[in-house]
A protein has these predicted regions:
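Phosphopantetheine-dependent thiolation modules in NRPS/PKS and related acyl-activating systems
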Residues: 2-36, 43-49, 53-87
Length: 87
């Protein structure tokens, strides 16, 4: 799996979680989860659950501030799966 594939799947998960009806194609690596996409702490928790289901990767996020952008989440998943990270 590549980081592009991770991004594509994660964009779909995120698009399902936000209330503003964002299309997966609008979720870029540099999209900020809270500011740009409107993801709140409950949606982050749901997103982490779905990440575990879809990717088999458990992200230990003790501080939600460690996942500020989609790129942060993609890289966290890639590291968990022992894959190269997105630049």
């Amino acid at each position: 799996m590549t980081t592009d594939q991770i991004h594509s799947k994660l964009a779909t998960i995120i698009a399902d979680k936000v209330d503003s009806h964002i299309a997966p194609e609008q979720v870029t690596l540099d999209s900020r989860l809270r500011e740009d996409l409107g993801i709140d702490s409950l949606a982050v928790a749901e997103m982490l659950y779905e990440i575990e289901e879809v990717f088999g990767a458990t992200l230990e996020v003790s501080d939600p501030q460690t996942l500020l952008t989609v790129r942060d989440a993609v890289n966290a998943i890639a590291l968990e799966l022992r894959l190269p990270v997105a630049n």
